[in-house]
Amino acid sequence: DKGRIIITSVEHPSLNLIANQLLNDGWDIKYWPVDRHGIIDLDLLDEMLSSPTKLVSIIWGQSEIGSIQPINLIGMECKKRNILFHTDATQILPNGLFDWSNLNVDMLSASAHKLQGPKGIGLLMLRKGIQDLLMNNPSYGFKNGAIRSGTESVPLIAGFSTAIDLLSEYVEVTDNQTLFPENNVSKMTSLLKKSLVKNKQLTFIGSQKERLPNNLSFLCHTESMIPIKGREIVRLLSKQGIYTSSGSACSSSSQGPSPTLVAINSDKSLQESGLRITIGPWISNNDINTVSNIIFESLQSLALKKQRI
């Protein structure tokens, strides 16, 4: 047994895939439960960070339901116990730059395509001394002195660098909160939420306080709570030029209930009914009105079909 790795029950599918590989390599993988809003249960902190935990990996901003984890608080507790801490900041970086020196994080990863950069390129930030620690410890699995295999793509790296250079706003991180700038994205997201919250065919999910400023997530159903599958509404909206997702984008074609919706204990009948909308900086008031109307009409159309069955 090489030790224990802690991840949350709402991680991105890509991290769960790696966790399963590490499990086969002899690591013990333990999942940190979340509450109904998708936030980790801090009452379990001492249990999760007890021996033999060696690494904790927590998604900072959850892509499917938008909830934000208190990463600085967790990082501080990991530091006290000499536990390595990694966070997935893929959903955070598009919303603004942050001060790496003030984060209680040893390792941070992100991806370019979320901030209008090229697909196929990511970054891994390491606290000073961490790379040597990983390379010199065979149990972590790095070989030949390399963090990743293959030849780096210079055009993709340059594209990612340019995308970061174009970020002009800042995210403030306290021990318990991640504070985002108020801008057009947050205003348009709030405007769309204000319009959609009136719709009796939608139930909002995820933390409504600690959440990504560009993310809206809900369960779809008829007014009498008959489930409408997320895949159905995604297909209908895409035909009208509105591109949304059910579940995480990379697994939206998967059959069966969403692991994230299962983790937050949503109604079993609605665990395939998730819908996620992400707002970009180019969205206008007119776009919001159009999207709201089309979503309303599409849900009504699907509800009528359900009633005929």
Describe each PLM feature range:
Residues 1-309:
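Pyridoxal 5′-phosphate
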